[in-house]
């Protein structure tokens, strides 16, 4: 099992996502002899998981069933153990596009946190790229390093435990893109400039408050970055249904009493503010 490449059969040591129905999911580490309790009954790893294909429908102890899904960065984001606040797939998709990430890209990131963005970046830049991720908190850095090895993506990532605002990313002039998710990104802008390639690259920072964005933009402009822009992603879900309205009688011949048509109306409850994504470009020179 790898978050980068699909594998058909479940093996010991794999991470599997159990879909329990109605949107409920849980991530489990598959171990021989282990058991997982679900609302549908017990799931025995040796009998019910190991050797089965990913995507299998497995019957639990009480007669209920679950689907065993292959892990992806998107599913991991929804099921990971939270060590910090995380970014979700909507923001991750935008920053991946705006940073122009592709296989072979070299990326510098801070902070690692729970690894939500890290897994998505690794999947995008593999098999020839590399991620340099910096985490200030020692225990979070150690746990992230362990997870990358468990998920078999360790070859594409280097984890450093240091303060990026003081010590930088540990590399110079190698990165195609830099991503910051830290409380004071403006203090790391200079290190981001040094980490990016001499021929240029892309920068992104995530901040929940507009005051953080203002200070970051000032630092970016002072450092020489150009093409500054700040975006906020607010998805709007629409409810589409068929409705019928009465048709007025406008002539001598009788017509239909009502006519159906498709109507789309926005849902009353939508996802609110998560944060601002600020982008900039380091140009050659």
Curated annotation (Swiss-Prot):
Region feature (Substrate): 20-22, 35-42, 64-65, 85-89, 110-117, 180-183, 205-212
A Pfam family hit: GCD14
The keyword Nucleotidyltransferase is annotated on this UniProt entry: no
TM spans (from-to): none
Binding site for S-adenosyl-L-methionine: 87, 114-116, 135, 140, 163-164, 181
Chief place where the protein resides: nucleus
Location relative to the cell: Nucleus
Protein's GO biological process: mRNA processing; tRNA methylation
Catalytic activity: adenosine(58) in tRNA + S-adenosyl-L-methionine = N(1)-methyladenosine(58) in tRNA + S-adenosyl-L-homocysteine + H(+); an adenosine in mRNA + S-adenosyl-L-methionine = an N(1)-methyladenosine in mRNA + S-adenosyl-L-homocysteine + H(+)
Superkingdom of the organism of origin: Eukaryota
Disulphide-bonded residues: none
Positions of modified residues (N-acetylserine): 2
Cited Gene3D superfamilies: 3.10.330.20, Vaccinia Virus protein VP39
EC number assigned by the record: 2.1.1.220, 2.1.1.-
Binding-site list for substrate: 274
Keywords, sorted A to Z: Acetylation, Methyltransferase, Nucleus, S-adenosyl-L-methionine, Transferase, tRNA processing
GO cellular component, one term: tRNA (m1A) methyltransferase complex
Annotated family: Belongs to the class I-like SAM-binding methyltransferase superfamily. TRM61 family.
Subunit structure: Heterotetramer; composed of two copies of TRMT6 and two copies of TRMT61A.
Function: Catalytic subunit of tRNA (adenine-N(1)-)-methyltransferase, which catalyzes the formation of N(1)-methyladenine at position 58 (m1A58) in initiator methionyl-tRNA. Catalytic subunit of mRNA N(1)-methyltransferase complex, which mediates methylation of adenosine residues at the N(1) position of a small subset of mRNAs: N(1) methylation takes place in tRNA T-loop-like structures of mRNAs and is only present at low stoichiometries.
The name this protein goes by in its record: tRNA (adenine(58)-N(1))-methyltransferase catalytic subunit TRMT61A
Organism: Bos taurus (Bovine)
């Amino acid at each position: 099992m790898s978050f980068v490449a699909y594998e058909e059969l479940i093996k010991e040591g794999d991470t599997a996502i159990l879909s329990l129905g109605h949107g409920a999911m849980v991530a489990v580490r598959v171990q021989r002899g282990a058991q997982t309790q679900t609302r549908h009954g017990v799931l025995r790893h040796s009998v019910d998981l190991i050797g089965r294909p990913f995507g299998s429908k497995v019957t639990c102890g009480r007669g209920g069933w679950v689907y065993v899904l292959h892990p992806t960065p998107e599913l991991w984001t929804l099921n990971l153990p939270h060590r910090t606040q995380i970014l979700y797939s909507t923001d991750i998709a935008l920053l991946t596009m705006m940073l122009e990430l592709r296989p072979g890209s070299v990326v510098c990131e801070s902070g690692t946190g729970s690894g939500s963005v890290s897994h998505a970046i690794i999947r995008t830049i593999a098999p020839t790229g590399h991620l340099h991720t910096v985490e200030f908190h020692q225990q979070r850095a150690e746990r992230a390093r362990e997870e990358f090895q468990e998920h078999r993506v360790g070859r594409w990532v280097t984890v450093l435990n240091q303060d990026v605002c003081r010590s930088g990313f540990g590399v110079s002039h190698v990165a195609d893109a830099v991503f910051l998710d830290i409380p004071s990104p403006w203090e790391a802008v200079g290190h981001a400039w040094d980490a990016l390639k001499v021929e240029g690259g892309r920068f992104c920072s995530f901040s929940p408050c507009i005051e953080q964005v203002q200070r970051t933009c000032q630092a970016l402009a002072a450092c020489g970055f150009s093409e500054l822009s700040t975006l906020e992603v607010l998805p709007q879900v629409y409810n589409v249904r068929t409705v019928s309205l009465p048709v007025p009688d406008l002539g001598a011949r009788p017509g239909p009493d009502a006519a159906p048509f498709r109507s789309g109306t926005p849902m009353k409850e939508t996802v609110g503010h998560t944060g601002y994504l600020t982008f900039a470009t380091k140009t050659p020179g």
